[in-house]
Structure formats: C-alpha cells, structure tokens
C-alpha cells in the first residue's frame, strides 16, 4: 500500500476513531448483558487500533489472521509490545469467533468482564505507539 503521509494519517485517524467507538459500544452494552456483542466490540476495538499501528508502520494485512501475525512479528516478538498483550489480542479474537459463530457455547460475564480493562489498556498502548510513529512521518510516499 503506497500512501502519502496525509493519506496514511487520514486512514490511521479513521481506524483509531473506529477503535474508540467500538470500545465505547462495548461499554455501553455491559448493562444489557449482551456478552457476545461486548466480545465482538472489544475485539474490533483492538483490531482497529492494531490495524492503525500496522498502517502507521507501512505494513499491510489482508485478513484478521494477517493482522495478528504482523502484530506478533513486528511488535510482540521484538518486545515493543508485551507478550501478555499479544496473547490478550489473540484471546479477544478467539472470544469474538466463539461469540459470533459457536452454536454450542454462549459467552458469559465470567468470559467477558475480566477482559474489558485489559482491552482498554491494550488499545491505549497501541494508539500511543501509533501516534508516536505518525509524528515521525513526513509527507512522502511510502516505498
């Protein structure tokens, strides 16, 4: 993906806004106890934040598994992001799959509630890394 600095900033800003909105949606549904919906919104909040990070660094993924792989390869393995945060991101993905597609198991408060604060912290860390990188980028196309 070849983007100018302005284009990259626009895409990254959009993803960050989507991450924040999805997290707010997750919080807003807690009182209704829609555990699958909360799991879905937590995952998509993290996914959009991680996607923004990858785009800021010029990485391009074409699937959810690709985003997980690139996040692990470029941020978790080198120690930029803690291993526990990489595992949390993968857990959010797995929980979203269970909530969206598993016809034999319904998520419960015990599955979902303990992940809200760690997900918020992960999203904040990833957005901070993204913003730091974006501050370094000049208005030149990616090579």
Region locations from a protein language model:
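Terminal alpha-helical segments
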Residues: 1-143
């Amino acid at each position: 993906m070849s983007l100018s600095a302005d284009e990259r900033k626009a895409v990254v800003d959009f993803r960050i806004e989507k991450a924040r909105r999805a997290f707010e949606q997750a919080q807003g549904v807690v009182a209704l106890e829609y555990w699958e919906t909360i799991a879905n919104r937590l995952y998509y909040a993290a996914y959009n934040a991680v996607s923004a990070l990858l785009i800021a660094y010029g990485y391009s993924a074409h699937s959810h598994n690709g985003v997980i792989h690139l996040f692990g390869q470029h941020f978790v393995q080198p120690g930029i992001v803690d291993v526990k945060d990489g595992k949390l991101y993968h857990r959010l993905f797995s929980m979203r799959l269970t909530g969206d597609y598993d016809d034999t198991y319904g998520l419960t408060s015990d599955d979902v509630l303990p992940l809200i604060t760690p997900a918020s912290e992960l999203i904040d860390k990833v957005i901070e890394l993204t913003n730091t990188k974006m501050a370094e980028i000049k208005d030149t196309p990616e090579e």
